Structures are given as C-alpha cells and as structure tokens.
Amino acid sequence: MRLLSLLTFSLFAVIGLAPAAQAKDKLTIYTYDSFVSEWGPGPKVKENFEKECDCEVNFVASADGVALLNRLKLEGSKTAADIVLGLDTNLTTEARASGFFAPSGIDQTNVKVPGNFKDDIFVPYDYGYFAVVYDSEKLPNPPKSLKELVEGDPAQKIVLQDPRTATPGLGMLLWMKSVYGDEAGAAWQKLQKRVLTVTPGWSEAYGLFTKGEAPMVLSYTTSPAYHMVVEKTNRYKALAYPEGNYLQIELAAQTTTGAKNPLAKKFLAFMTGPGFQDVIPETNWMFPAGKTSKPLPAAFDALPKPEKTLLIPPYEVAKNRRLWVNEWLAATSR
C-alpha cells in the first residue's frame, strides 16, 4: 500500500495535480501610510489578528484619511477594501452619504473617547489632539497661542498638511475656523508667511521636521512621547493653546463589500480589544479608544493637556468643507 500511495503521489506531482495547501481567507484593509510603516501599528496588528483568525491580512496604503475616502469614492462598489481604517469624525457624514459603508454590528461597550462618540457604522480606535510640535533646540521661544502662531515671526517656519488629502490638514483647517470664524481667511493669509511647505500626508511633514527643515510641524500633543520613549530625548515638545486644541477621533468601518466577508466584522470587534489597543500608544502614538491590558507609557503623563477641546459637528463639516477648503486655497495662494 505504501508503494501504491507513493506511486500515486508521484503521478499527481508529475502531472501537476498534487494536492495544494488550502488557501487562507483574506481581509483587505485600506489605511494610511504611517499605519503600515515598519514603525507603525500595522505589522503588530496584522500579526496579532492573523494568529486569532488564521487568515491573511493585506494592507493597502494611501497618503492619509481624506485620500482614503477619495479613493473609495473613485473605486465605488468595485473596491477591494473590506475595511477602511483611518477616517475621522470630520469625514463621517460624507462617508455615510457615499453609501459604501455598512453597519459594524459589533458591541462597542469597550470604546471610550472624549465626547462619547458612538456610531453604528464607524468604530473609534484611537484619539488625540492636534498641536504644534516644535524643536526646543532650534526654537527656545515657540508661539504660546494660536494667535502668536498666526501673527509671529515669518522666519520661524512650520510644515503643514493639505486638508484635501490629510486628516491633520483638515484638522488644522477646522481648528482655524473654530477659533477665527469668519476671519479665518485673513488669519490664513498671515499664517501663510510662516508655512515652509504643505505636504500630502502626515509622514512627509513630520519627516521634514525631524530632518531639521523647519522648527515646527502640525502634529499631535502625543507626538513627543515617541521621542521620549524611543530616542530618550525631551528635545521635541507639543503646545496646548489657550484657544483650545482640535480633537481627532480616528475610525474604521467595513465597506458594503466587506460586509460579505465575515473577517471584516471579526476585525472590527478585535480592534476594540487589547490585541489592537495595546499596540496603539507606542506605535501610532495616540490615546487608545478601547480596552487595553496595560497602562499607558509613563511618557504620556508628561504630555501637555489641552485647556479646551475643539470639535465641529460632522454634519457641519460635511456641509462646509468644500467652502472652507476654497477659502484656504484663496488665502494661501495670494
């Protein structure tokens, strides 16, 4: 029998009919580039979830959250995305109206974010506050308020992100609108004198900053924690402004395509627990939105705490985003 089995196997191998290993189920996640970088949360999240699901996770990266939504709109119902990870509350109304997202169907009891944001489609996975981050060795006297940033020395440059492609850029746009209202256009004209460049996403902007191209960058109050934990330096600092800092809550959702893949719902549930949440503080350098199994790194205790939280309702952002982007374009192109 052994000989017969061996001969049978050999025959199948020769004619290319040898039994193949069963292909694993796949989950495709669209996200932003820093999430999937070697130092981002992507690799560890992928490892943890694949152990749990015995599946294959494929990340597809775009520049940032706004670009993710733009891409999904272009692809429509033909998208390969099961999950889109990297939107934020500023995009939820527009994203819902697209019709490309499906209810999560998961228990969100473990999810806790400022303002108690809850949604049947969009699930929070982390949050943070936009802030000016500066190099204390190059800028010993940074702007102590948004007003000082807008009206300060044009020689002290800042790197910003494009609100048309990057959620931090959109966050800055809404921050300016929250503080300056109808005078935002005039404020942008003043601030433009300090802007070294505007990048498509966060990664490019922060890279220019750490390379010394500018002493300031738009980032998060939590960004200095990376330098404290990984580089063992307090050189880079964030600023909490008296006018308030704009809140960002990052979200993930399953697409209508993903709703047909059982792994999508399973991933969203996994995302609210320690297998995902424990990875966030020291890779995405944001506050976790779900259940963790350990406390935050001690460096987070040293971070500035915003005196006031700013957040424009999603429906108002959706109604006015194009108008406000055009206002920014008109002001900064003069």
UniProtKB/Swiss-Prot annotation:
InterPro entries: SBP, ThiB, ThiB-like. GO terms for biological process: thiamine transport. Pfam families: SBP_bac_1. Keywords: Periplasm, Signal, Transport. The keyword Transport applies. The keyword Lyase does not apply. One of its GO terms (cellular component) is outer membrane-bounded periplasmic space. Its main location: periplasm. Gene3D superfamilies: Periplasmic binding protein-like II. GO terms for molecular function: thiamine binding; thiamine pyrophosphate binding. Thiamine binds at residues 64-65, 166-167, 202, 220-223. Residues 1-23 form the signal peptide. It is found in: Periplasm. Belongs to the bacterial solute-binding protein 1 family. NCBIfam families: sfuA, thiB. Part of the ABC transporter complex ThiBPQ involved in thiamine import. The complex is composed of two ATP-binding proteins (ThiQ), two transmembrane proteins (ThiP) and a solute-binding protein (ThiB). This is Thiamine-binding periplasmic protein. It comes from Brucella melitensis biotype 1 (strain ATCC 23456 / CCUG 17765 / NCTC 10094 / 16M).
